[in-house]
């Protein structure tokens, strides 16, 4: 992740739930609730510290870092990579990943049909997408509403 980037799930504020609950598995219960219930944006350093992303570097270095990381696998037999990947994925399956993903997808559909979500989405033709997203994010001063370059 670029060290000046932000990540989060703003739709949890009004129009959805994540269809994959990897946040719980990666961040633990406390941080997953903190960020998914609020929809707050997470800066790169925090995302790295809490385990949401594995690496942070300047944007100009990302391609080189990805290439270098990928090259670490070139001498490992594909069957060895596949077996280890299946074992890791199975551990997550045993913790309920598939069920959580199915429920997340269902709840995402439900969340988009609540009265509040319908009112929010229904205002897009009149106000425009950028305006309704700004109204969602302005109170939190994040995502597109985040002050930049010394703005306050």
Positions of predicted regions on the chain:
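Recognition helix of helix-turn-helix/homeodomain-like DNA-binding domains
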Residues: 50
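C-terminal long alpha-helix characteristic of the crotonase
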Residues: 1-5, 12, 53-102
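CoA-thioester-processing core
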Residues: 1-35, 65
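Glycine-rich phosphate-binding loop at the start of an alpha helix
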Residues: 17, 41-42
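C-terminal alpha-helix plus adjacent terminal tail
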Residues: 43-44, 75-152
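Short aromatic/basic micro-patch
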Residues: 26, 41, 56
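Conserved catalytic core of Hanks-type protein kinase domains
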Residues: 26, 38, 75
């Amino acid at each position: 992740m670029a060290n000046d980037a932000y990540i989060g799930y703003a739709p949890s504020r009004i129009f959805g739930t994540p269809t994959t609950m990897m946040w719980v598995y990666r961040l633990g219960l406390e941080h997953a609730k903190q960020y998914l219930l609020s929809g707050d944006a997470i800066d790169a350093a925090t995302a790295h510290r809490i385990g949401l992303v594995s690496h942070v570097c300047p944007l100009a270095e990302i391609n080189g870092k990805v290439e270098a990381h990928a090259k670490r696998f070139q001498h490992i037999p594909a069957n060895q990579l596949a077996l280890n990947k299946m074992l890791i994925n199975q551990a997550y399956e045993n913790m309920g990943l598939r069920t959580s993903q199915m429920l997340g997808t269902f709840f995402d559909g439900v969340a988009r049909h609540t009265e509040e979500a319908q009112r929010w989405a229904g205002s897009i033709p009149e106000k425009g997408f950028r305006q309704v997203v700004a109204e969602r994010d302005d109170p939190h001063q994040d995502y597109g509403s985040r002050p930049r370059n010394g703005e306050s």
